């Protein structure tokens, strides 16, 4: 049932219906119902411990909150727009459950620190879930890389064939991207792991509360050191959205290549049927819709970030109603990135790699040109001169339809008498890849080492 507005004493007129609807946030902040109850439980336990509330009153409130928590889990709670937000809805339901003593719950607390606490708890809970899902994706990338250490494919710059690489090496590049995402979310935990509870409206409270105790009850590392900062800070949410945006950018880049490489023109990969869809008119189609959807959802997460950045940019201290707009984008980002990570994990796990098609693409594309330039440099020809020579040979090959491996040895000897039969060996794509064993390179030994190191990271060593 609706309760009398908690702030209504100063007002003579009832609110306009449209204004009340515009002001209400229960349609979306009910997402934090669990967190709101948890925050209230911690607060009332602290009030009991500090003897601000009697044990009898506190125990009634605690029992009532626990009943609401059980109902929320089992059947849900009946929220009303008349009660404006999740905090007032929970208090209204608590009042129905235990009577007027519920009004004592708000002693030494404001909705300003209450909502900030709820939001901290919401993000704090979800960060380890996201990190865990990212690690599952990384594990699939490592497994797929281990299967494809010696799978040769074209490496690209400017979407043009550049040099042959190991497909395993390519996959490990994404492992590293997602590792940075993991580290960013882990760092995000530090700024999220602070309790605003007890900061009250902005200046603290005259009640002898114990903020360290309520922070401990909620599992926070400690309370904010400044009450103004506690109620006005949304940096932790901005960090989360920034991290989510970078993560989605990484997923989008991977999706872009999956989409290309599953096409008829490339034919390097094939997605499992379970991660593809068909066409209502074209019977032959197998569309990479999941990859396209992930790529498309990047924009909404970017929008969530820029929405909150724009909301916060001009706000004076401390709390402003603008900050009600901090939640929907945050909730949306969480609900977007988690399924995106899970679906990408499944796509990688079930991905069919067409090794022959990949390697075939490296045999007539001149991606071995750098190998020839390096080879000539080892024979004493300055690299810049070698680069010019090979460029001319490539141009000639393009005009005649021949490749560098088709040039007779006597033609090579005209360039330098030091060139031997082994020039043809170095021009083989697999040899070219295998020889690039500088640290972090695409050489097979280096890729195996990257995989070994990655497994240690995933094992926490």
Curated annotation (Swiss-Prot):
Enzyme Commission no: 4.3.2.1
Catalytic activity annotation: 2-(N(omega)-L-arginino)succinate = fumarate + L-arginine
GO molecular function: argininosuccinate lyase activity
Keyword Transferase: no
Keywords: Amino-acid biosynthesis, Arginine biosynthesis, Cytoplasm, Lyase
Compartments where located: Cytoplasm
Record GO cellular component, one term: cytosol
Family as reported in the entry's similarity comment: Belongs to the lyase 1 family. Argininosuccinate lyase subfamily.
Stated name of the protein: Argininosuccinate lyase
């Amino acid at each position: 049932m609706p309760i009398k507005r908690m702030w209504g004493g100063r007002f003579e007129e009832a609110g306009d219906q449209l204004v009340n609807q515009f002001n209400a946030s229960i349609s979306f902040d009910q997402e934090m119902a669990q967190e709101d109850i948890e925050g209230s439980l911690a607060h009332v336990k602290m009030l009991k411990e500090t003897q601000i509330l009697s044990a009898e009153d506190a125990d009634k409130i605690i029992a009532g909150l626990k009943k609401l928590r059980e109902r929320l889990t089992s059947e849900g709670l009946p929220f009303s727009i008349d009660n404006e937000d999740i905090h007032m809805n929970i208090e209204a339901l608590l009042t129905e459950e235990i009577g007027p003593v519920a009004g004592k719950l708000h002693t030494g607390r404001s909705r300003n620190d209450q909502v900030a606490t709820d939001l901290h708890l919401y993000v704090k809970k979800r960060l380890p879930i996201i990190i865990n899902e990212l690690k599952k994706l990384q594990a699939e990338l490592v497994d797929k890389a281990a299967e494809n250490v010696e799978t040769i494919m074209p490496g690209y710059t400017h979407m043009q064939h550049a040099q042959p690489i190991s497909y395993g090496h390519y996959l490990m590049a994404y492992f590293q991207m997602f590792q940075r995402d993991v580290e960013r979310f882990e760092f995000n935990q530090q700024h999220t792991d602070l309790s605003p509870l007890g900061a009250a409206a902005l200046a603290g409270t005259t009640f002898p509360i114990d903020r360290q105790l309520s922070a401990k009850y909620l599992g926070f590392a400690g309370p904010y050191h400044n009450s103004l900062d506690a109620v006005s800070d949304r940096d932790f949410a901005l960090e989360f959205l920034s991290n989510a945006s970078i993560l989605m950018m990484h997923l989008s880049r991977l999706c872009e290549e999956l989409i290309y490489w599953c096409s008829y023109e490339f034919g390097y990969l094939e997605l499992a049927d379970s991660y593809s869809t068909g066409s209502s008119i074209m019977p032959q189609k197998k569309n990479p819709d999941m990859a396209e959807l992930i790529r498309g959802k990047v924009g909404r997460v970017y929008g969530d970030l820029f929405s909150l950045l724009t909301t916060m940019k001009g706000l004076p201290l401390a709390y402003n109603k603008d900050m009600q707009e901090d939640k929907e984008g945050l909730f949306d980002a969480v609900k977007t990135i988690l399924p995106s990570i899970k679906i990408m994990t499944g796509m990688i796990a079930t991905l069919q790699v067409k090794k022959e098609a990949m390697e075939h693409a490296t045999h007539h594309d001149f991606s071995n040109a750098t190998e020839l330039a390096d080879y000539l440099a080892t024979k004493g020809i300055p690299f810049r001169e070698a680069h010019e020579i090979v460029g001319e040979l490539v141009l000639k090959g393009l005009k005649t339809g021949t490749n560098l491996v088709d040039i007779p040895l006597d033609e090579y000897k005209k360039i330098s008498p030091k060139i031997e039969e082994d020039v043809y060996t170095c021009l083989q794509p697999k040899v070219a890849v295998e020889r690039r064993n500088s640290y972090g390179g695409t050489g097979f030994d280096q890729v195996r080492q990257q995989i070994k190191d990655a497994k240690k990271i995933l094992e926490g060593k």
